[in-house]
């Protein structure tokens, strides 16, 4: 199996904005994978710091790293630029301030190829950016269908990979928040079932601060996805929006001292 997995081509997509202080950690996290990617595409979304120069300086060490520069347009357009450029069979996402364990790609892609899975995700840790301490672990469901995803998004983008050779090119809806969830809806609408790969191999580095305004804006964008992408009427859109709103205010990671 190991040799077969090593022959699989993976494109890693990283959206970056003013990430000069963290992008090297991200690049080295991908470089440390026991299953090396075919390419690591970094989209500099109009940064006004030294993000691009840090990436360029590392390209001699990691020649498979590619950088795409664009005016500031948001995460959806940045990731879409990466998807458009991706040439690997599998596409995986890792934003600039997040990291993976060395076994993430090998575990995930091995699981997908062994089980004919086209869309997969996994658990991830919350890391406090200021102290680098582990806050807890987000546990993903074993399976996700389109119907499940209509009621919420219980997975993290940093854990996801999909088989673009089988599913084709798909692009995220052009909203500032919730674009990844809208993308998972696209991947599963035809009956494709998402599956959880084993272990916990991703780390989400969380900054502090109030998220109240962000949660309201995200709710608006989620409503737009129901209306514009899924073509639901107002009443049906509001019906499905409610679990998102409740979840946004109650969701928290499983903390290790809770078992």
Task: For every predicted segment, state its role.
Residues 91:
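Short aromatic/hydrophobic "clamp" motif used to bind/position activated sugar donors
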Residues 21-24, 49-58, 99, 103:
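Acidic helix N-cap motif at the loop->helix transition within catalytic regions
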Residues 84, 137-217, 221:
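Conserved nucleotide-sugar donor-binding catalytic segment
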Residues 29, 44-54, 71-73, 95:
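A conserved acidic beta->alpha catalytic loop
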Residues 103-134:
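Conserved donor NDP-sugar-binding/catalytic core segment of glycosyltransferases
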Residues 70-86, 107:
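Glycine-rich, basic loop-to-helix element that forms the pyrophosphate-binding segment
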Residues 18-32:
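Short, well-formed alpha-helical segments that are part of the catalytic scaffolds
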Residues 8-11, 39, 182:
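Cell-envelope/extracellular polymer assembly enzymes that use nucleotide-activated donors
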């Amino acid at each position: 199996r190991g040799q077969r997995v090593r022959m699989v081509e993976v494109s890693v997509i990283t959206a970056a904005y003013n990430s000069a202080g963290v992008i090297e950690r991200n690049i080295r996290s991908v470089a440390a994978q026991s299953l090396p990617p075919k390419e690591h595409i970094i989209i500099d979304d109009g940064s006004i710091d030294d993000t691009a120069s840090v990436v360029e300086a590392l390209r001699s060490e990691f020649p498979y790293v590619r950088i795409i520069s664009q005016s500031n347009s948001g995460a959806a357009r940045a990731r879409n630029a990466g998807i458009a450029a991706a040439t690997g069979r599998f596409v995986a996402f890792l934003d600039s301030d997040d990291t993976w364990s060395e076994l993430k790609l090998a575990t995930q892609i091995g699981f997908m190829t062994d089980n004919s899975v086209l869309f997969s995700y996994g658990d991830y840790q919350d890391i406090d950016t200021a102290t680098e301490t582990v806050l807890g672990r987000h546990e993903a469901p074993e399976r996700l269908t389109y119907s499940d995803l209509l009621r919420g998004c219980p997975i993290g983008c940093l854990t996801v990979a999909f088989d673009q050779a089988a599913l084709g090119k798909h692009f995220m809806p052009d909203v500032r928040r919730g674009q990844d969830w809208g993308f998972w809806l696209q991947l599963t609408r035809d009956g494709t079932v998402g599956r959880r790969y084993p272990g916990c191999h991703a780390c989400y580095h969380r900054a502090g601060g109030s998220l109240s305004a962000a949660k309201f804006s995200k709710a608006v964008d989620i409503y737009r996805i129901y209306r514009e992408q899924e073509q639901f009427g107002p009443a049906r859109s509001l019906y499905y929006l409610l679990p998102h709103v409740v979840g946004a205010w109650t969701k928290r990671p499983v903390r290790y001292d809770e078992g």
